[in-house]
């Protein structure tokens, strides 16, 4: 599945389109590939002490997450991948959807600058395997490139 997903993601990137179009399609591919209930981007700028909801697939979501809080904010602050098998045991977890049980959050970093995070949620405990995490880290490069383009167009 990894190879096919990576090929799909690469093939839908169209540099002639606005970055938001590419980001939206990438999220749709992920949403319909995995057994997840939510996937989206949280945008980060130094102007705010929070991450702001960007494009996503799934239920209505939290619109602002404080930097350093919850899984998303902690990932942003620490600038490393967080894979949480049971979000209910994560100190300070912010429950945008109380049915979510596991979460994978990947920082989107360009030239040592945090641009945002890619957030995936699942209803299943310990859903995100090492294989899924590895694949999503590779896919995150596309999101980083498009988010950088968004901020510098």
Where are these regions (language model features)?
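Short loop/turn motifs at secondary-structure junctions and domain boundaries
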Residues: 33, 96-100
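Regulatory sensory and allosteric helical modules in signal-transduction proteins
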Residues: 44, 50-96
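Regulatory loop-to-helix N-cap segments in sensory/regulatory domains
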Residues: 121-139, 146-153
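A short, aliphatic-rich beta-strand micro-motif
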Residues: 102-109
């Amino acid at each position: 599945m990894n190879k096919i997903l990576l090929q799909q993601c690469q093939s839908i990137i169209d540099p002639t389109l606005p970055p938001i179009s590419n980001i939206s399609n990438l999220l749709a591919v992920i949403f319909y590939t995995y057994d997840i209930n939510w996937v989206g981007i949280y945008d980060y700028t130094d102007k705010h002490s929070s991450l702001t909801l960007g494009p996503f697939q799934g239920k209505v979501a939290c619109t602002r997450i404080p930097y350093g809080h919850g899984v998303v904010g902690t990932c942003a602050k620490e600038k490393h991948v967080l894979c949480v098998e049971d979000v209910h045991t994560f100190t300070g977890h912010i429950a945008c959807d109380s049915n979510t049980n596991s979460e994978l959050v990947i920082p989107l970093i360009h030239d040592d600058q945090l641009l945002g995070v890619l957030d995936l949620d699942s209803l299943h405990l310990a859903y995100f395997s090492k294989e899924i995490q590895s694949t999503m880290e590779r896919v995150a490069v596309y999101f980083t490139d498009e988010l950088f383009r968004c901020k510098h167009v």
